[in-house]
Amino acid sequence: MSTPETAPPAGPAAIFIGPPGAGKSTVGALVAAMLGVSFLDADTVIEEAAGKPVGDIFVEDGEEAFRALEGATAARLIAGHPGVLALGGGAILDPGTRRLLAGQRVIYLETGFAAAVHRTGLDAPRPLLFGNPRARMKVLLDERLPIYAGLAWRTVPTDDREPKHIAEEIAAMLEPGPSAGPRP
């Protein structure tokens, strides 16, 4: 029987946040399979609703339009998806989304700059047309890392680790028991 200390919060079983390349989608899907629950990637839900990839939404409609879609999608999924949810890396920039994440089982997949650059393919030589994506990644991480850390129920390092091992660690955290209680 659940007690107030061990009862899971209303909302998803777990919500993954972190920078691009952290492994939110990969690890989230593995954790969902281990827990026997469904998995949703908010960016995929946005793409399906918009009928085009996230990158095209940014280019054709602008970042402001994308962020509005992202905020509305995050609100709907946090309120109505009982499984595992992966939010896009920038979803935490929306104050409304941050409020909705309070008290949820938010798993921050902590990723260092070098790993994020490698996982997103930004360590490959780029034509001048693309500017300096590594510098942009550095600015993005500097801006977002404190927000991710502040929202986290649990922080899980991902550098130099296999997704399967990360998922096993997180699934164990989410099993019923004192360590799986709501965020303090």
Q: Locations of the language-model features?
A:
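NTP-dependent small-molecule kinase module
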Residues: 2-9, 30, 34, 143-184
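Hydrophobic anchor at the beta1->P-loop junction of P-loop NTPases
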Residues: 16
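Conserved lysine of the Walker
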Residues: 24
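Hydrophobic positions on the alpha1 helix immediately C-terminal to the Walker A/P-loop
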Residues: 27
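ATP-dependent small-molecule kinase phosphotransfer cores
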Residues: 41-100, 125-126, 134, 138
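Short glycine-rich anion-binding loops that position phosphate/pyrophosphate groups of nucleotides
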Residues: 89-92, 112-114, 161
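A glycine- and Lys/Arg-enriched "phosphate-lid" helix/loop adjacent to the NTP-binding pocket
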Residues: 103-146
